[in-house]
Amino acid sequence: MLHKKYRPNVAAIIMSPDYPNTCEVFIAERIDIEGAWQFPQGGIDEGETPLEALHRELLEEIGTNEIEILAQYPRWIAYDFPSNMEHKFYAFDGQKQRYFLVRLKHANNIDLNKHTPEFRAYQFIHLKDLLKKIVPFKRQVYRQVIAYFKREGYL
């Protein structure tokens, strides 16, 4: 049996600064794939903890890591890359992720161009609209993680 290889990764479900009064999440459109909306995420570097990677990735991708950590998904969750994009991370079949639910402290600190841009646009959307916007191959993972945070009373 062939074992799949997954890239270790962190992902952030970022609630707006108005949370818990409003339940809107941050999504961003990838700069390299028009129409590909997702949560901020990124690889965990050698010797880095998932929490350290989360703070670094948020600073790199959205220009701020001023967040309050609300919760963490209790285990790693994986998805496979679609066959048409496997070349991007040729050594991996997909990614295994550690999800964090966080609240952004100040929305006006978001700067997609602070570092090398990975996103072209962002928006805060209501949870009910989330899965319609997200790239199809990530929907099952998003559905599972969101369901967990709902069961735990965060969403």
UniProtKB/Swiss-Prot annotation:
Its cofactor is a divalent metal cation. This is RNA pyrophosphohydrolase. Its EC number is 3.6.1.-. One of its GO terms (cellular component) is cytoplasm. It comes from Helicobacter pylori (strain HPAG1). The keyword Hydrolase applies. It comes from the Bacteria. Belongs to the Nudix hydrolase family. RppH subfamily. GO terms for biological process: mRNA catabolic process. A motif (Nudix box) lies at residues 42-63.
